[in-house]
Amino acid sequence: MLGNQSADFSEKGEDEIVRQLCANGICMKTTEVEAKLDEGNIQEAESSLREGLSLNFEEARALLGRLEYQRGNLEGALRVFEGIDLQAAIQRLQVSVPLEKPATKKNRPREPQQSVSQHAANLVLEAIYLKAKSLQKLGRITEAAHECKSVLDSVEKIFQQGIPDAQVDNKLQETVSHAVELLPALWKESGDYQEAISAYRRALLSQWNLDNDCCARIQKDFAVFLLHSGVEASPPSLGSQIEGSYIPRNNIEEAILLLMILLKKFNLGKAKWDPSVFEHLTFALSLCSQTAVLAKQLEEVMPGVFSRIERWNTLALSYSAAGQNSAAVNLLRKSLHKHEQPDDLVALLLAAKLCSEEPSLAAEGTGYAQRAINNAQGMDEHLKGVGLRMLGLCLGKQAKVPTSDFERSRLQSESLKALDGAIAFEHNNPDLIFELGVQYAEQRNLKAASRYAKEFIDATGGSVLKGWRFLALVLSAQQRFSEAEVVTDAALDETAKWDQGPLLRLKAKLKISQSNPTEAVETYRYLLALVQAQRKSFGPLRTLSQMEEDKVNEFEVWHGLAYLYSSLSHWNDVEVCLKKAGELKQYSASMLHTEGRMWEGRKEFKPALAAFLDGLLLDGSSVPCKVAVGALLSERGKDHQPTLPVARSLLSDALRIDPTNRKAWYYLGMVHKSDGRIADATDCFQAASMLEESDPIESFSTIL
């Protein structure tokens, strides 16, 4: 019935535009129709179209309304559209546009009729769509959304089994695609976000026969809305899901699913690459600490999308956030190779930071940090402070690698110098203040450490847990246990229940130091109940990084309780606690050390020595196990002189790893005494005595 129903434009000069409408093989200029519209004679204009193009009432009105819309007369277009009984037209079209099977020889003659029916359907649907657009431009957003929704409702009535992949008029498909894309935007603009969510899901789950680009735009818009709208979307309806399919439980999961589907389309060449999609996916996966998944997605991106340097650096950042520092450092080594970008300041700083967390890589990190400092010039000079901070951390970690006392002292001095230099650039950086305080504390400059601990608490407003822990540890090292407990209690009052684990463990150890073992046991029991409740609350969905952030897990609580009972000589309780800890972590040098203490307390020295040696086999750098074996051998050395050199070697090795271990100094003094070296023994006992006066209840390194 209708031929080409689109308006043709041809320019004559700069100002004159002559429009033409074509239908049923007939074309007519719109000059006469527009003149009647200008005079307000809508009915006469409609009659001209009906007579000139052989149209019925709804078709003529639809074309007339579109003409008004194209002319920019939105109010006029609405008046024309209001005169159409669109629902009645839809009902007629529902009968005239059946979903036919692909044409065969018998029904091929019916194809022209089907084409005519689809043209008629498009004309009516386009009228509703343009009415919605007119209302939107006039600021009547809610009305526009309802009109746009009626387009999709009408399509579902006409095509009850969904729009077929073939035999659909292009213009009809274009109208449907525009309406599907417009509806969620209108609901968002009107402020009805739940309707917007429903519209997005309807667009993606119903059969609209959308092209890949249109579908990709809708998926991206929906994902961005879920991530940034602040509206919590309810899970999708189970009725719309295929059995066994994955159902997102919250906004972030649904957004990640959409963005990963989009990336898959990009990789398969089904949609044009959009870099913002990967940026949104990075944000979403970072929110839920799933950067390992992000790295996997980045590895699957087709070559050429990212430069290899950018890919390596982004992968390194993702792996480092996932705790896979070794993989991250290897990627940064490639990126910083002399034939790539050896002076990339950000990559140098990241490499230095990662190396500062591992003693074996600290020397390499020192080189990266020094290169970063040298390259921090001009517009990047503000990053010099970051470079100095990384240099200080790397030097401090390097000082912990077994070396000569002179070299250790030199590295510690240079570490403090670098961190002090960084403070000049970033004097308001709380993290830098904290790290400088810890460096002073590890060197037993407790007065300076206390000052920086208080500065950190002031800088953060007391909102960061590690600041209170640090101050309590410094006070315990100053043997001010009651004050440390007051600080711990104050921190507990200001800390959420789920975050109290490290403070409760600290409080239990303070109780032990003040000879209150009963209260210490009760604190450990409360801590155990808290950790178990937390594990059950989060369930199997709890990520590794989230568990590490708590700093106290169930194994540590059972092990701490076992250590406490061992100090009270409650050996049966120790055995029960160790069994519980062993169920959670089968191999642990610290647990074997406590087991050795248990056997030693029972006067069974062979099993004790075996447990300590097993701990050393498991972790060759375990200082407690080295000291315990050295202590046992030094006791035997009174009767068996040949064991003294072995004990001396083990204790000296322990002191190279941890020169502040007072027990190692004490037992080394005992070895020297048994060996007849009284002067050396005196020096060792004096060192042990001095360290005992500044020994914290937990190592300062536990708060880093």
UniProtKB/Swiss-Prot annotation:
Q: Which InterPro entries match?
A: NPG1-like (IPR043376), TPR-like_helical_dom_sf (IPR011990), TPR_rpt (IPR019734)
Listed A to Z, the keywords are:
Calmodulin-binding, Repeat, TPR repeat
Mapped TPR repeat ranges = 24-57, 58-90, 177-210, 309-342, 430-463, 555-588, 589-622, 662-695
Under the cellular component aspect of Gene Ontology, which terms does the record hold? extrinsic component of cytoplasmic side of plasma membrane; plasma membrane
Q: A GO term (biological process) for this protein?
A: pollen development
**Sorted alphabetically, which SMART domains does this protein's record hold?**
TPR
Q: Where is the signal peptide?
A: none
Name the residues that span the membrane.
none
Q: What happens when the gene is disrupted?
A: Normal pollen development, but no pollen germination.
Coiled coil ranges (UniProt) are: none
Name the organs or tissues of expression.
Expressed only in pollen and in pollen tubes.
Annotated Gene Ontology MF terms? calmodulin binding
Name the job this protein performs: Calmodulin-binding protein essential for pollen germination, but not necessary for microsporogenesis or gametogenesis.
Record's protein name: Protein NPG1
- What is the native source organism of this protein? Arabidopsis thaliana
Which gene name belongs to this protein?
A: NPG1
